[in-house]
C-alpha cells in the first residue's frame, strides 16, 4: 500500500499503521463496564470499532473480585441511593400532609425490607438493560477480572479461574473507584456505602463518620426513616469544597430534622458489645450504634490492573495519569472516570467516554470540558450547585464580585408549618456581568439547577437572568428576580513577589 | 346515648391526663428546668454553638445594638445534647441559635435579623436601633 505523504513531507502515521497493519482481536478492549466503560464501548462500536469489554461478576456489594455491569452508579451508588432518598422523604411528607387536610389515623409503619427488595429489583433490571445495550451495539462482553499485560494485550481471568488473553489496538481503563475505610482500631466493625445500601436490618441507631456528600446523604436517609443518627466530621461544617453559606444551611437543616452533628470530631475506636457497636470519639465520648458507616473517601480501582508493570504512570493515590484526551503515557492505553480521579461524577465519566470515542475512533479529537459541571447532594432537602462557590470566585477574581442571595420559607412550608428555609445564590463577575456561580439548597434544587447549568454554559449574564420572566408560583423564579446585591466583594490584587 | 357520652368523657379525661403528664415530664427534666431558669434570669439569652455561622450572625446583631447577651454554647457543655432536646420540646425547633428576650422566645437567626431590621428588636430591648441617630 502506497504511503501517503503530508504537505510537510512527514509520513502520515495512520497510513503507515495501515501499511504495517498488525492484526488485533479488537480495535478496543475496555476494562470495566460501569458508566464510562459502557458509554465508551458503545460509542466506539457505533464509530465502527470492534469492541470487547470485561466486568467482574454482579453483586450489590463490591470487592476486588465482585462488580457487575452498570458499575458503582447503577448497582451501589447514585441509583440505589436516590431510591432510598425518595423512600426517606416520605416520612417528612406525611408529617407535612396533616396541615394540608390529610388525616392519617392509623399508625404509619416503615418496612425497610420492602424498600430494599424493590431497590434490588430495580438495580437488577438496570444491570440487564446495560448488558442489552452492549449486545445491541455488538460489543462482546466477558465476565471476569481484566488486567493489562502489554501495551496492546489484556488478560481476563474468568469465573472458573481460566485466563484468556486478547489483543487490542487500544485499551481503555474504566475500573472506577471503591469506598475506603480509615485505619481506626475496630474498623472491621464499620461498613461502607456499599453495605449501607444493602443492610439486612434497618439500623435504629446509626453513626456516620465523614463530612462529604455520601456521609450527609446517608445521615439524611436514615434519619428520614426514623433512625437516631450521629454525624461526625473533621471540619466545622460538612461538605468541604462547597459554598460556605450553603454548607451552613445544610448543617442547620440536618440538625433541624434531628441529626446530631459532631463537628471537629473523629472516631478513635470501635468495639463490639452486647448493646451494639461502641464508638469512642476524639473528645472521649462514648456512643453505641447498630451500624457505623465510614464515608471518608474513595480510591481508584487500579491496584490489580498490573499497570505499573506495563509502564503506565499512576499518581500517589493510585489514579491513572492522563492527558486532556484521557490518554496515558502509553499511547495505546487510555483511561476515563473515577479511575483517573478528575471529577468523580457519573455524567463526567460519560462525557470523558464520549470524548474518548470521538478521539480514538470518530476522527474528531475532543477534549473533555470541566467548566460549569453541575452537581447535587441528595440530602433532605437537597443542595445543588454549578460554577464557582463564593469562596472560589473570590480566590479566582480579577475584579469585583457581586453576590445575590434569596432566602425564604417555601410556599409549601407556610401551610405545613415546617421551619426550613430555602437559600438560592448567584455569583456575578461585575466587570462582564456574567453569572459565574449558582447554588441552591431546598426542595427540587437538583431539578432546578440543571436548567441554570445550561445558562452558565452559554455564558449568561445577570441582565439576561433578570430579563427572563419567572414561572409563578415556584421557587425557581427566585433565580430571575434577585434584583438587589446582597454584598459586593472588592477585588484584592495578590501581592507581587520576586520568587 | 348517655352511656356513650360518659365513655367519651372518660376517654377525653384519660387523653387529657396523658397529655398533661407528657407535657409536665417534658417540661420538668433538669435540662428543661435549666432552660427556663436561664431565660428568666437574663434579659437576652442565646442558645448557641460556638462554630455555627447562624449563631455568629445572631450574636453580631446584639453587638450592633451594644447589648451583651447571655450565651449558652451547647457544644461546649457535657449536657449540651440534652439541653438542645429540651429546648426543641419547648420552642418546637431543634436548630440553633434560639434567642430569648425578657423570657420570651424571639426565634432563630433569621427571626433575630428580621426583628433587628424592622426595629422591633430595639423596641423590645428599649434601646435606640440606629447608632447614627445617637451621634
UniProtKB/Swiss-Prot annotation, chain A:
Q: Where in the cell is it found?
A: Cytoplasm
Binding residue positions for glutathione: 35, 130
Matching entries from Gene3D superfamilies are given as:
3.30.390.30, FAD/NAD(P)-binding domain
Q: Which GO terms describe its cellular component?
A: cytosol; peroxisome
Quote the SUPFAM superfamilies the UniProt record gives.
FAD/NAD(P)-binding domain (SSF51905), FAD/NAD-linked reductases, dimerisation (C-terminal) domain (SSF55424)
Q: Where mainly found?
A: cytoplasm
- EC assignment: the record states 1.8.1.7
TM region(s), chain numbering: none
Task: Name the cofactor(s) required for activity, per the record.
Answer: FAD
What EC class does the entry list? oxidoreductase
Tell me which residues bind FAD.
35-36, 55, 72-73, 81, 146, 338, 346, 472
Record: active site: 472
Output the Gene Ontology terms for molecular function. flavin adenine dinucleotide binding; glutathione-disulfide reductase (NADPH) activity; NADP binding
Q: Name one GO biological process term.
A: glutathione metabolic process
Q: Which family does it belong to?
A: Belongs to the class-I pyridine nucleotide-disulfide oxidoreductase family.
The record, for NCBIfam families, names: gluta_reduc_2, PRK06116.1
Query: What is the protein's name according to its record?
Result: Glutathione reductase, cytosolic
Which organism is this protein's natural source?
Answer: Arabidopsis thaliana
Print the organism lineage: Eukaryota, Viridiplantae, Streptophyta, Embryophyta, Tracheophyta
UniProtKB/Swiss-Prot annotation, chain B:
Family per UniProt? Belongs to the glutaredoxin family. CPYC subfamily.
Q: Which PROSITE patterns match?
A: GLUTAREDOXIN_1 (PS00195), GLUTAREDOXIN_2 (PS51354)
* Job of this protein: Has a glutathione-disulfide oxidoreductase activity in the presence of NADPH and glutathione reductase. Reduces low molecular weight disulfides and proteins.
Q: Which NCBIfam families match?
A: GRX_euk
Localization terms from the record = Cytoplasm
Presence of the UniProt keyword Electron transport in the record: yes
Question: Which N-terminal stretch is annotated as signal sequence?
Answer: none
* UniProt name for this protein: Glutaredoxin-C4
InterPro entries found in the cross-reference section: GLR_AS, Glutaredoxin, Glutaredoxin_euk/vir, Glutaredoxin_subgr, Thioredoxin-like_sf
Protein's UniProt keywords contain Glycoprotein = no
Task: Name the PANTHER family on file.
Answer: GLUTAREDOXIN 2
What Pfam families does the record point to?
Glutaredoxin (PF00462)
